Each structure stands twice: as structure tokens, then as C-alpha cells.
Curated annotation (Swiss-Prot):
The gene is nuoH. It is an enzyme of class 7 (translocase). It is a multi-pass membrane protein. InterPro entries: NADH_UbQ_OxRdtase_su1/FPO, NADH_UbQ_OxRdtase_su1_CS. It comes from Caulobacter vibrioides (strain ATCC 19089 / CIP 103742 / CB 15). It catalyses: a quinone + NADH + 5 H(+)(in) = a quinol + NAD(+) + 4 H(+)(out). Its EC number is 7.1.1.-. NDH-1 is composed of 14 different subunits. Subunits NuoA, H, J, K, L, M, N constitute the membrane sector of the complex. This is NADH-quinone oxidoreductase subunit H. Its main location: membrane. The keyword Nucleotide-binding does not apply. GO terms for biological process: aerobic respiration. Belongs to the complex I subunit 1 family.
Length: 356
């Protein structure tokens, strides 16, 4: 038995499987309480209480909703393509979770430390729209199909800007490894990429602040989040691509959507706000137990994710929905040329600046 566990292939498989399970459990538990927080924030803006019945302060509301969804009957429309109809939410959910494989929670706390992790994240976030397109087409109904087409157009429009903004971070960090990008931002708060990545690069502060703002807005559009929730606009498409879904498949779509939102919050934290770095030197952690030190840094990272989720929730609560033509105009006529200028500015500084 000891020889079996000493086998490198076996130990790697067990460690990777354990890491995947831990991340999935963490994401699911986080979604349960962040979804409640989203509803509470929305209620607070509208001067009402929000969910407050199930459990103390309504803390168990998400778990009650889970049982409500799971125990309902799965209704499949008569004219729907049954296989694709059921596969669509599963594909959306899987693609929403696989992106977490390269997110570094603390030094060494990452499922797969890929050297091209940032490209992997970009690819996974792009593929998520296929589940929505499949669901809209398989429903054999006008509203879901229109919602799916809107989602595809929206993703294409804003994925370009997200990719170009990521290039500015790659130019600053000199790496596509997410752990390396975070490590480059260690030390004081001015080493974070949003401030230019160090005092020597402080001239890039306005460039990176604009890049961060554009990334945040593009992330709202990428995740079909208000004010860019055109694929599920209630006043036009009832519920968009989710119209014909009920019970567990609907729940899977909702979990996938919120998982993508939290993943985008994690990306903003990693790319611009130092990831697990608290904004001051962490030399004092050398005297701590390694697990305790990493747990502290992981909590710092989680606090940043929660802050950005709060920003997503506030955008949902206070910003009115854009019209479809305004959404496209913003993506192609404003964000695309601006992001190209930002890439050129950072590249010029890296080539001709004092640190060249």
C-alpha cells in the first residue's frame, strides 16, 4: 500500500483530485452566500429587507432555494431537442468551473499552475457562451433563441476588449502565469498593476486605471450582468434563453452565471489588485506556520473578490439597462480603439521607458 501511494502518478492524481474537490466546494459555498448578499444589496438599495426568514438573518435562504429547484419537475417543451436541451446547462456549468483550475488563491494554492494560465482563463470564459447558444436553439422558441443570439454577439464584442486589456497586464508583468503576475505585485500597494506596477511605472497610473475600469465594465457585459443583461431582458424577452427551463437545469444555468461572475471578480483582483497580496510587506508571515500564512493570504484574496462582487451587485441595483445598439456601439466604437491605445501606451513605456 505504501509503495502504491509513493508512485508519482498516483500521488499527483490524488493531490489534483483533492484540489479540484476543494475548489468546487469552496466555489459552491461561496455562491450560496454571495447570491444571498446580492439579493440583500439589491433590497437595501430599494429600502426593503430582502430574504430574512429561512435561518438566522436569512442565511439559509440559498439552501432552501436549492431544495426548491431540485424537487420540482423538469419540464421539457414538446418541440425541443431533448438531448441538447439537457446538455446545454451542464456544458455551461462545467465551463464555468474549469476556469478556476488556474486561479491562485495563495502561494502554491492552485490546482494547475499553467505558464499560459491567463490564456486558458480567456479561452474558458469565451467557451461559456456555447451552452447558452445550445440552450436557446434547443428550446425551439423565439425568445430563447433571440436571447442566445444576443449573448453570442455580446460575448464577441467584449471578449476583444478583455483580451487587449489582458495584454497590458502581460506587458507589465512579463509573464502569462497568474501566480507570477501576483508575485510581481508583492510589497506595498503601489506595486499593484492598477497603480502601474511600482513607483518606476507610476506614469502608467492613468493608463492602468482606465484599463481596470474598462475590464470591469467588459466583465459585466461578458457575464450578461446588468446593465448589460440584454440576453435575458425581462421587458423584451421575458427571461431570454432561460424561458423554457425549470427545476435543476435552470438552477445549473444560474450557478454557472454566478460562478462566471465570481471568476471575473477573481480575475480583476489577480490582474490589477495584487491577488493575495494585502498591499503591505508580509515578512511577518515567515514566523507563522506555512498553512496559517497561506490561509491569511487566501482570506485577503477572498476579501477582494467579495468587494468586486459588491461592485457587480451595485451595478445591477442602480444602473439602468442599455439598449442593444448602445451596447454594440460602446464595445466596438469606444472600448476597442481605447484598449488598442492602452496596449500601445504600455508597450511604448516598456520599450522606451527608464526600465527598458
Amino acid at each position: 500500500m505504501q509503495a502504491f501511494f509513493a508512485n508519482p502518478a498516483v500521488s499527483w492524481t490524488l493531490l489534483t483530485t483533492g484540489g479540484i474537490l476543494l475548489v468546487v466546494i469552496w466555489v459552491l459555498l461561496s455562491l450560496a452566500f454571495l447570491l444571498l448578499a446580492d439579493r440583500k444589496i439589491w433590497a437595501g438599495v430599494q429600502m426593503r429587507k430582502g430574504p430574512n426568514v429561512v435561518g438566522p438573518f436569512g442565511l439559509l435562504q440559498s439552501f432552501a432555494d436549492f431544495f426548491k429547484f431540485v424537487l420540482k419537475e423538469i419540464v421539457i417543451p414538446a418541440g425541443a431537442d431533448k438531448v441538447v436541451f439537457i446538455l446545454a446547462p451542464l456544458i455551461s456549468l462545467i465551463l464555468a468551473f474549469v476556469g478556476w483550475a488556474v486561479v491562485p488563491f495563495a502561494p502554491g494554492w492552485v490546482v494547475s499552475n499553467l505558464n499560459v494560465g491567463i490564456l486558458y482563463l480567456l479561452a474558458m470564459s469565451s467557451l461559456g457562451v456555447y451552452g447558452i447558444i445550445m440552450g436557446g436553439w434547443a428550446s425551439n422558441s423565439k425568445y430563447p433563441f433571440l436571447g442566445a443570439l444576443r449573448s453570442a454577439a455580446q460575448m464577441v464584442s467584449y471578449e476583444v476588449s478583455i483580451g487587449l486589456i489582458i495584454i497590458t497586464v502581460i506587458l507589465l508583468a512579463g509573464s502569462m502565469n497568474l501566480s507570477t503576475i501576483v508575485e510581481k505585485q508583492s510589497g506595498w500597494i503601489w506595486n499593484w498593476n492598477v497603480f502601474g506596477g511600482g513607483l518606476n511605472n507610476l506614469v502608467l497610473l492613468p493608463v492602468m486605471v482606465v484599463a481596470m475600469g474598462m475590464f470591469y465594465i467588459s466583465a459585466l457585459a461578458e457575464t450578461n450582468r446588468p446593465p448589460f443583461d440584454l440576453p435575458e431582458a425581462e421587458s423584451e424577452l421575458v427571461a431570454g434563453y432561460q424561458v423554457e427551463y425549470s427545476s435543476t437545469p435552470y438552477l445549473l444555468f444560474m450557478v454557472a452565471e454566478y460562478s462566471n461572475i465570481v471568476l471575473m471578480c477573481a480575475m480583476i483582483s489577480v490582474l490589477f489588485f495584487g491577488g493575495w497580496n494585502p498591499g503591505f510587506p508580509t515578512d511577518f508571515l515567515s514566523s507563522w506556520h506555512p498553512f496559517a500564512a497561506n490561509l491569511f493570504l487566501a482570506l485577503v484574496f477572498y476579501a477582494k473578490i467579495c468587494f468586486w462582487f459588491f461592485m457587480f451587485a451595485m451595478a445591477k441595483a442602480i444602473v439602468p439597462r442599455y439598449r442593444y445598439d448602445q451596447l454594440m456601439r460602446l464595445g466596438w466604437k469606444v472600448f476597442l480603439p481605447t484598449s488598442l491605445v492602452l496596449v500601445a501606451a504600455v508597450a511604448a513605456w516598456r520599450v522606451f521607458g527608464p526600465a527598458a
